[in-house]
């Protein structure tokens, strides 16, 4: 049964990622007063399959001066981590019910940095290396904020277990009392997934394509798939943390429907932001984190620590 659940999770995740690419192209098209892809299949619905077929049937070219092992390992690692991150998410039941689910997600997502750094260094290209260094600095910096925000939320729920977060939010979504944290979390997830306006690692006008410039065909597709799977995963995590869905025991499918709708709305907001906002300058990106987000999150962490003590209400113990 576990193997079947794992296969279903992988297949549904890949299907969601494939159609997210189509939704993004359609949404960007309509926001720029054009149609977007509409040739392959009815209304362009088969476009993701055409893209996959084209990418995976091309010959993968490797630069002669690249480091072969790291060059091949990097995209495989990125894709594996993107799949692994889904295991503890409650949808409505997690594949593996970790007591430290949030800690597992935070630790595993940090490993993505290695795949980006390896790909940039192994490509033996200045553009790729600069893109990789930018991405690593950005992701490591914003993980500081994500960790502190998660710590504040954990002090409210009293557990690292994602199911306990849903129990905590049975009567009130955490986005209402913790809206400053939710806003900073959402902005940090944009930076963590390297999306507009924080897509400095693949600034087309400066770095052509960033860390994956020397990749083509299948390996490039693996990076591309990992990026879009991380976007959906981050929004699913945001839904669990701040928009916790009540779990009705009489009809569990209501949980899944509600969870999916909220995740889709947040993902659509990601795409809308890409169409609406220009790219940040690198110094603005770092100033936003170290001069604005970090002091604010530390202050709110102190608030989350002191308030339960002040009003004599400890969080639920597991």
Curated annotation (Swiss-Prot):
Top EC class of this enzyme: translocase
Q: Where is the signal peptide?
A: none
Predominant location: mitochondrion
Pfam families with a match to the protein in the record: NADHdh
What's its membrane topology?
Answer: Multi-pass membrane protein
What are its E.C. numbers?
Answer: 7.1.1.2
Q: Write out the function statement from the record.
A: Core subunit of the mitochondrial membrane respiratory chain NADH dehydrogenase (Complex I) which catalyzes electron transfer from NADH through the respiratory chain, using ubiquinone as an electron acceptor. Essential for the catalytic activity and assembly of complex I.
Oligomeric state and interaction partners are given as: Core subunit of respiratory chain NADH dehydrogenase (Complex I) which is composed of 45 different subunits.
Membership in a protein family: Belongs to the complex I subunit 1 family.
Q: What is this protein called?
A: NADH-ubiquinone oxidoreductase chain 1
This chain's source organism reads Papio hamadryas
Q: What lineage is on file?
A: Eukaryota, Metazoa, Chordata, Craniata, Vertebrata
